[in-house]
């Protein structure tokens, strides 16, 4: 097939001459850990006339694409909910061969059994291959990574070979270590096929191997802002050769406070570069960043122009009090874990809550592990590996894992604590229903979250989801000022919470109160509510989950044609977990968790690697 040829195909030798374009060979790493990151970096004063010229437009429109009429293009864009803004935007490619990627790239695509480009790939590839700046706004799991990596490979193949002292040609900035590593995993397979080198640099890991990769020369560098600035300041790499810049999850990087570091980094890159910015949302802060960094860019939006969730996700909201969450979570897990393939992520608000909930669930026999920002990189990698391979199918996480965590077969997301914004809510639930799969998201929504209720209802309505009548009641109560008074759902037990906690396993369901029979009290209360119709199949007006949620279990059909229709209870499982779980071992060399058909003897402690808190 036709592809992109370049002088790289002629096998030029990679010499070891003097550093080009101002490459640095500075001394050892600085030991300074505090202060203003990037304060040693001086903003470059670029003279484009003195810089080597480079190519960035390599797009060859396929004959099949050229014959496609404007009406056919518009029909395709409407069917895929593609909205384009900007001048001279190329037509979308409907098939992989229309992108004219090199044969070795097409071979990898064939091995991965992809059938057709996703919407963002179909429209993004022609734009990126044309050398244009672009902004891509699409939901999580939509194929954004390949949208910029494959054009990056074509771009690199048309540039001169790296020489000693040269920095990367393609720089991908990512907000978290996990996302950077996942991008590197995707890049590695394509780079091997194309005889290119890539590396991933991030904090929390030894600097030595990362420095050696940079010194040997890499065409693609995937980096978190902090570690990259560290290496730039001490001269271990430079960005003089960088002509293809990617800002992945730009909204998340701004949320995490990386804007000053991003600006310091971009100041080190020549201004005539090609820049691609990717985001799941389009707030004003991201718009401002695009105006500052991009020139005459094409804006591609997939899905609704406003804040929207993946329509393949069934969203179920339970309006409750904080002290009710633990019992509700256990009942949910009893139903979910009746199928061993049901990987589940439970999102919590704080690191402390993450540790507490993980310890309690493990003591009760659940195969759960926790991940948050205070974990070491080695421990985070180990936990994610256990989760991905099904050895610990329950992951309890803070928002550190809500973006960029790419595990294909996550079936359920549970928002134990509602996040601070609807954007974070959308990113959290986006961990399920990756690509074209479906998934389910449960959310515990309390009166403490009332400021978010209107935004949540908007997200649910946009996705054609059933809306819990209690959410609508909260809106009315908020408007009348009753949400904290007698007329609303005031939590009259807030004074019992310890400092920094709102419910959780360290309030009513701590070990002492649990042994005294509080669990039985809650179960009796739940049974009474069921008999009185609160959780009944016939009437959801005062209930918890689902719309027309057929009582054959969570995996059954859910019809959202009537957003205010009858709710039916999906908790028909009578299997009891808690301490009645068979012996289970976990570890790198142990077999996966065996899911019993019947209850068995109490389990022994769930073994962890050295240094992991029980």
Curated annotation (Swiss-Prot):
There is a cross-link at residues 32, 45, 53, 340, 343, 388, 391, 411, 437, 451, 470, 523 (Glycyl lysine isopeptide (Lys-Gly) (interchain with G-Cter in SUMO2)). A motif (Q motif) lies at residues 94-122. The modification Phosphoserine is found at residues 24, 480, 520. ATP binds at residues 114-116, 121, 138-145. It catalyses: ATP + H2O = ADP + phosphate + H(+). A motif (DEAD box) lies at residues 248-251. The keyword Oxidoreductase does not apply. GO terms for biological process: alternative mRNA splicing, via spliceosome; androgen receptor signaling pathway; BMP signaling pathway; epithelial to mesenchymal transition; estrogen receptor signaling pathway; intrinsic apoptotic signaling pathway by p53 class mediator; miRNA transcription; mRNA splicing, via spliceosome. One of its GO terms (molecular function) is ATP hydrolysis activity. It comes from the Eukaryota. Its EC number is 3.6.4.13. Changing residue 53 to R: Abolishes sumoylation, abolishes interaction with HDAC1, increases TP53 coactivation and promotes polyubiquitination. Pfam families: DEAD (PF00270), Helicase_C (PF00271), P68HR (PF08061). It is found in: Nucleus; Nucleus, Nucleolus; Nucleus speckle; Cytoplasm. Residues 125-300 form the Helicase ATP-binding domain. It is an enzyme of class 3 (hydrolase). Residues 477-614 are annotated as: Transactivation domain. Arg-502 is dimethylated, probably to asymmetric dimethylarginine. Sumoylated; sumoylation, promoted by PIAS1, promotes interaction with HDAC1 and transcriptional repression activity. Sumoylation also significantly increases stability, and reduces polyubiquitination. Keywords: Acetylation, ATP-binding, Biological rhythms, Cytoplasm, Helicase, Hydrolase, Isopeptide bond, mRNA processing, mRNA splicing, Nucleotide-binding, Nucleus, Phosphoprotein, RNA-binding, Spliceosome, Transcription, Transcription regulation, Ubl conjugation. GO terms for cellular component: catalytic step 2 spliceosome; cytoplasm; cytosol; extracellular exosome; membrane; nuclear speck; nucleolus; nucleoplasm. There is a cross-link at residue 53 (Glycyl lysine isopeptide (Lys-Gly) (interchain with G-Cter in SUMO)). Residues 1-15, 488-498 have a biased composition (Basic and acidic residues). The modification Phosphotyrosine is found at residue 297. Involved in the alternative regulation of pre-mRNA splicing; its RNA helicase activity is necessary for increasing tau exon 10 inclusion and occurs in a RBM4-dependent manner. Binds to the tau pre-mRNA in the stem-loop region downstream of exon 10. The rate of ATP hydrolysis is highly stimulated by single-stranded RNA. Involved in transcriptional regulation; the function is independent of the RNA helicase activity. Transcriptional coactivator for androgen receptor AR but probably not ESR1. Identified in the spliceosome C complex. Component of a ribonucleoprotein complex containing mRNAs and RNA-binding proteins including DDX5, HNRNPH2 and SRSF1 as well as splicing regulator ARVCF. Interacts with RBM4; the interaction occurs in an RNA-independent manner. Interacts with AGO1 and AGO2. Interacts with ESR1, AR, EP300, CREBBP, POLR2A, TP53, RUNX2 and HDAC1. Self-associates. Interacts with DDX17. Interacts with BRDT. The large PER complex involved in the repression of transcriptional termination is composed of at least PER2, CDK9, DDX5, DHX9, NCBP1 and POLR2A (active). This is Probable ATP-dependent RNA helicase DDX5. It comes from Homo sapiens (Human).
């Amino acid at each position: 097939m036709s592809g992109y040829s370049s002088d790289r195909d002629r096998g030029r030798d990679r010499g070891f001459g003097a550093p080009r374009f101002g490459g640095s060979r500075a001394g050892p790493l600085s030991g300074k850990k505090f202060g203003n990151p990037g304060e040693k970096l001086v903003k470059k004063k670029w003279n484009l006339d003195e810089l080597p010229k480079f190519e960035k437009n390599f797009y060859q429109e396929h004959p099949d694409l050229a014959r496609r009429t404007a009406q056919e293009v518009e029909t395709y864009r409407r069917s895929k909910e593609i909205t384009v803004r900007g001048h001279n935007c190329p037509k979308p490619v409907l098939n992989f061969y229309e992108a004219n990627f090199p044969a070795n790239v097409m071979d990898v695509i064939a091995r991965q059994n992809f059938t057709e480009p996703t919407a963002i790939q179909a429209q993004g590839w022609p734009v990126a291959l044309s050398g244009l700046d672009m902004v891509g706004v699409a939901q999580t799991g939509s194929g954004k990574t390949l949208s910029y990596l494959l054009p990056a490979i074509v771009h690199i193949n048309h540039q001169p070979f790296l020489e000693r002292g040269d920095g990367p040609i393609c720089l991908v900035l990512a907000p978290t270590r996990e996302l950077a590593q996942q991008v590197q995993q995707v890049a590695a397979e394509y780079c091997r096929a194309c005889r290119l080198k890539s590396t991933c640099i991030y904090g929390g890991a030894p600097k030595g191997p990362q420095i050696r990769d940079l010194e040997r020369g890499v065409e693609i560098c995937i980096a978190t802002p902090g570690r990259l600035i560290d290496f730039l300041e001490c001269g271990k790499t430079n960005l003089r050769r960088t002509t293809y810049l990617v800002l992945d999850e730009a909204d998340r990087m701004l949320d995490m406070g990386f804007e000053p570091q991003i600006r310091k980094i971009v100041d080190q890159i020549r201004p005539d570069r090609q820049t691609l910015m990717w985001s799941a949302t389009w707030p004003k802060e991201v718009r401002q960043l695009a105006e500052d960094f991009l020139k005459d860019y094409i804006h591609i939006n997939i899905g609704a122009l406003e804040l929207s969730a993946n329509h393949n996700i069934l969203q179920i909201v339970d309006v409750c009090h904080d002290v009710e969450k633990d019992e509700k979570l256990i009942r949910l897990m009893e139903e979910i874990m009746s199928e061993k393939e049901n990987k589940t992520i439970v999102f919590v608000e704080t690191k402390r809550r993450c540790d507490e909930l993980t310890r309690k669930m493990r003591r009760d026999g659940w195969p759960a592990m926790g991940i948050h920002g205070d974990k070491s990189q080695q421990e985070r990698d180990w936990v994610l590996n256990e989760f991905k391979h099904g050895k610990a199918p329950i992951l309890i996480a803070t928002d550190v894992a809500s973006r960029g965590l790419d595990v294909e077969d996550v079936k359920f997301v549970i928002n134990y604590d509602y996040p601070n914004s609807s954007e974070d809510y959308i990113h959290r639930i986006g961990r399920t229903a990756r690509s074209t799969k479906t998934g389910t998201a449960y959310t515990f929504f309390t009166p403490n979250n009332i400021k978010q209720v209107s935004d949540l209802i908007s997200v649910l309505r946009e996705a054609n989801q059933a809306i819990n009548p209690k959410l609508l009641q909260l809106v009315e109560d908020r408007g009348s000022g009753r949400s904290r008074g007698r007329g609303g759902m005031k939590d009259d037990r807030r004074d019992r919470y310890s400092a920094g906690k709102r419910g959780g396993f360290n309030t009513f369901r701590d070990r002492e109160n649990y042994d005294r029979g509080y669990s039985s009290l809650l179960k009796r209360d739940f049974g009474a509510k069921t008999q009185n119709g609160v959780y009944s199949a016939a009437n959801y007006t005062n209930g918890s989950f689902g719309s027309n949620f057929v009582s054959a279990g969570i995996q059954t059909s859910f019809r959202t044609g009537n957003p205010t229709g009858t709710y039916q209870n999906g908790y028909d499982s009578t299997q009891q977990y808690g301490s009645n779980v068979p012996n289970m071992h976990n570890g790198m060399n142990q077999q996966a968790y065996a899911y019993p058909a019947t209850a068995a003897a109490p389990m022994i402690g769930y073994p962890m690697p050295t240094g992991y808190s029980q």
